[in-house]
Design a protein with these regions (language model features):
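N-terminal glycine-rich phosphate/pyrophosphate-binding loop and immediately adjacent elements
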Residues: 2-136, 504
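Rossmann-like flavin
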Residues: 94-202
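Flavin-binding catalytic cores
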Residues: 116, 322-323, 358-363, 381, ...
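A glycine-rich dinucleotide-binding beta-alpha-beta segment and adjacent secondary-structure elements
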Residues: 182-196, 362-371, 426-492
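Helical element adjacent to the flavin cofactor pocket in flavoenzyme catalytic cores
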Residues: 209-263
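Mid-domain catalytic core of redox enzymes
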Residues: 220, 250-381
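Active-site-proximal substrate-binding core of FAD-dependent oxidoreductases
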Residues: 254, 512-529
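A conserved FAD-binding loop/helix module that cradles the flavin
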Residues: 489-510
Length: 529
């Protein structure tokens, strides 16, 4: 007799998504998390002062309003909900100007038109195309196993589909430059395109439609990002399963070519009657199961997995008052914006930042985005305060050694805060009650499978995206090992807070085991115009 129907390795949001769906399919599930708390990239902590909550990783749940997860899992019943602030994004510049992106399309276009009427018209066209008209296609692409380009091309036809596919021939910078004219608008949208830490390399333009589709789809989890994994854990518990922390898996047991369970670091063996699914990084998963069980080409690629040229360094501030941005004189709505970009005033500065990251230097130009979550949900801070953060791009190895993040943390904190003060007028010592710098090295410590501070568990470059993430034999979450699945961010459509790998793996397991499901899978991608 086995201990569980299925075992999930890793208690991050993808592993728990798979667990919640399989629980709803009638399975008894065990989720095993190596660290003291579940959540992985969806964690919420109080690193500054009591009552000031910060999402250490995922904060902007992009496109979550269109994801099947809320509906299928009835997450509202288990404590998860979110808000969509009406003023979604903004870009502030040192000259005091700003661009503001609203959920109201006309207001957004009015903001853009202050710089370029043509760019405002272009934005309106792109909005109708990707945010509205092609949204169903983009959702289906996200929540189905990725297809090889030839198969995808067969399923998409017409002028709009042709334009959609043509993005994959270009890099992100050139795609943005082709669409927009004004330098500040180009600078903002180039920065926005890197919000998922995509590398600017040939072929990276393929992500443009999907990212643009979420330009007004940023959601904030009420009470903290950890509310999502906690909701999934409640579903698992309700179905008779367990979620264990401090349960590090050492080995995936294989018998007669089939995954049958796991062995923990302490020697405890747990058995699974039907499947094992891994939500941690793919290279480690392959090692735990046995390299010889996988295609040689896939193993070689994972041996040389590119974790990324840049990570993020986050300054968390416990404040008395929310930041007031100097650009409010240009457009007062900037103080209402959920996601604010600043630090970059032109494209040369954007390029400079990423060159410094690639060459492993602390950037001369600090640029990134952030938020004051407590301005939208009071649960993020005490009644007499606010919680704000800013996460500039930065390399994992800085000035020759990752340890420099620890040794020079005070200096880096001061430099980052001083840049923030260039844009916000009230971040003086009287307003800042406490500060906490969360570095790329801290990311790896907190979530060990984010190796080298890789917040996406692998760089977003063309040969590590879609069917190539990580390899065609693994991208769809199934593996060559019977009963073993990979449901983490290192496969298929993974790398952001979308639950897609977990969802895709759950559907694959249900299909393979011929289980009954109480949800309707997202339809396969198809487009004809």
């Amino acid at each position: 007799m086995t201990d569980f129907d299925g075992i999930i390795i890793g208690g991050g949001h993808n592993g728990l998504t798979t667990a919640a769906y399989l629980t709803r399919a009638g399975q008894k599930i065990a989720v095993l998390e190596a660290t003291p708390q579940i959540g992985g990239g969806t964690s919420t902590e109080e690193p500054t002062l009591p009552g000031h909550k910060f999402n250490l990783h995922a904060n902007f749940f992009m496109g979550f309003g269109h994801a099947p997860l809320m509906r299928d899992l009835e997450l509202h019943r288990y404590g998860y909900s979110y808000i969509e602030p009406p003023v979604q994004q903004a870009g502030a510049f040192r000259d005091g100007s700003c661009v503001v992106i609203h959920q109201d399309l006309d207001k957004t276009c009015a903001s853009l038109a202050k710089f370029s009427k043509r760019d405002a018209d272009t934005f309106r066209d792109l909005y109708h195309r990707y945010v509205v008209e092609m949204r169903p296609l983009l959702v289906s692409l996200m929540y189905n196993a990725p297809l090889p380009l030839d198969q995808l091309t067969d399923r998409l036809s017409g002028p709009k589909a042709k334009e959609f596919l043509a993005h994959s021939k270009h890099d992100l910078f050139s795609v943005v430059a082709d669409y927009f004219d004004d330098d500040r608008i180009r600078t903002l949208f180039t920065s926005y395109m890197h919000v998922i830490t995509t590398e600017n390399v040939p072929g990276s333009g393929m992500v443009f439609p999907g990212i643009f589709a979420n330009v007004t789809g940023f959601t904030l989890p009420i009470g903290g990002a950890v509310a999502y994994p906690l909701a999934c854990a409640r579903i698992v518990a309700e179905g008779g399963g367990v979620v264990r922390t401090n349960a590090k898996v050492r080995e995936i047991t294989i018998e007669s070519g089939r995954a049958t369970g796991v062995i923990l670091d302490n020697g405890t063996e747990l058995t699974a009657g039907k499947f094992v699914a891994s939500g941690i990084d793919t290279p480690t998963t392959v090692e735990m199961a046995g390299r010889e069980l996988f295609e040689t080409e896939a193993v070689e690629k994972l041996d040389n997995w590119h974790w990324g040229n840049h990570s993020l360094v986050t300054l968390h501030l416990a404040l008395r008052d929310a930041p007031v941005y100097k650009a409010r004189d240009f457009d007062p709505d900037i103080d209402e914006a959920f996601n604010i970009f600043f630090g970059m005033d032109d494209l040369d500065q954007v390029r400079s930042c990423f060159i410094d990251c690639e060459e492993k230097r602390f950037p001369d130009v600090l640029m990134g985005n952030g938020s004051c979550n407590s301005a939208f949900d009071p649960a993020y801070a005490p009644a007499d305060g606010h919680s704000a953060f800013w996460w500039p791009f930065a390399p994992y190895t800085v000035d020759g050694d990752p340890a420099n993040w620890d040794e020079q943390k005070k200096d880096y904190t001061s430099r980052i805060l001083n840049v923030w003060r260039d844009y916000a007028s009230n971040l003086d010592d009287d307003n800042v009650k406490a500060e906490f710098l969360y570095t790329p090295l801290d990311i790896e410590r907190h979530t060990p499978n984010m190796i080298n501070g890789a917040v996406r568990m692998g760089a977003y470059i063309p040969n590590q995206l879609g069917v190539n993430r990580p390899h065609p034999s693994l991208a769809g979450t199934r593996t060559p090992v019977e009963g073993l699945y990979i449901c983490g961010s290192g496969v298929g459509n993974g790398g952001g807070m979308n639950g897609a790998p977990g969802y895709i793996a759950a559907n694959a397991i249900v299909d393979d085991l011929r289980l009954k499901r109480d949800w309707t899978p997202v339809a396969a991608p198809e487009w004809r115009d």
